[in-house]
Amino acid sequence: MPYVTVKMLEGRTDEQKRNLVEKVTEAVKETTGASEEKIVVFIEEMRKDHYAVAGKRLSDME
């Protein structure tokens, strides 16, 4: 049973997340041969103040 975790900054619409889950599921199905019913996709959304690059939070870089 494939498990896929997508980590991204918050702010996407439900429609964007729905499309993402559908496309990731299809890619895993085509690549691994796993049945759609066995593929699990997690979306973890992060706030910009909980994510940093080069020692700086993204919320501080705006």
Swiss-Prot record:
It comes from the Bacteria. The active site is at 2 (proton acceptor). SUPFAM superfamilies: Tautomerase/MIF. Substrate binds at residues 9-12. InterPro entries: 4-OT, 4-OT-like_dom, Tautomerase/MIF_sf. The mono- and diacids apparently bind in different orientations in the active site of YwhB, but the highly stereoselective nature of the YwhB reaction using a diacid suggests that the biological substrate for YwhB may be a diacid. This is 2-hydroxymuconate tautomerase. The lineage of its organism: Bacteria, Bacillati, Bacillota, Bacilli, Bacillales. The gene is ywhB.
